[in-house]
Amino acid sequence: MMDDFPDARPLSGTVALVAGATRGAGRGIAVELGAAGATVYVTGRTTRERRSEYDRPETIEETAALVSEAGGHGIAVPTDHLEPTQVEALVARIAREQDGLDVLVNDIWGGEKLVEWNVPIWEHSLDKGLRLLRLAIDTHLITNHYALPLLIRKPGGLVVEMTDGTARYNDTHYRLSAFYDMAKTSVTRLAWALSHEVAPHGGTAVALTPGWMRSEMMLEHYDVTEATWRDATTREPHFVISETPRFVGRAVAALAADPDRARWNGQSLSSGGLAADYGFTDVDGSRPDCFRYLVEVQEAGRPADATGYR
């Protein structure tokens, strides 16, 4: 699974927390950290006993099992990251059970069903918009508040703030909702701010975005499976540039395994950009460069063709 790394278990002995790992990018990241040998704490609100407001079947127990099957050690801890006492208890448990925390991935989101796309702010549901911002921003702030003291106990810690879109892309593109736009650009700025706070302790903080990701929800949207995803290109031809959640997972694993990762401190990164630098691939052996494709092909009005972009 980690053929892209000379050392099949470069993260053996590494302790990671993937906050928001029930599905999507968080699950892909947790699995790839596990494939690299890490112990991975995975959190979320949906368990075998209880579903979150998403009302979806994926659970954190499933994610933890996938981490262990990949070669790591997955530990599921039900956590609502809007509840400070729950996050504090989570970090206290990691501190008791492990010798510190090496990697923190903040992938908490939960706003898909709250966004009203292409609706101006004065028409958008205020309750949904504010709830979206709490889920997208407050959760990250709360988690950093409690987890970073453990992470900075020793040098070399890595913080990855997951978002949608690189800073360069988002600076020139309206993300179809004021609430969504603010949520995703705020997380990028948070990573930049954190980079200044963890650097004196030998830490690194970055913002990271996947490309057009074939998450569980996206596959369902197009009524396809991972095995048949190309069928979706009949409805949306530019879906040809899409990638699996494991691709951005390999990006995080590559960062965590890089002893020189501090060179990225404060930067806004993408799965495709890091693949070009580190040489890892998606599960099909390709290297999709989504944001370059979006600008140079889709937005340029060219026919859908991923040749040269994956």
Locations of the language-model features?
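Catalytic loop of short-chain dehydrogenase/reductase
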Residues: 110-114, 122-126, 157-200, 211-213, ...
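Amphipathic alpha-helical dimer-interface segment in Rossmann-like NAD(P)H-dependent oxidoreductases
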Residues: 131-153, 167, 195-196, 200
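C-terminal helical subdomain
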Residues: 207, 227-310
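A short helix-coil junction within the Rossmann-fold of NAD(P)-dependent oxidoreductases
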Residues: 36, 97-98, 111-116, 146-155, ...
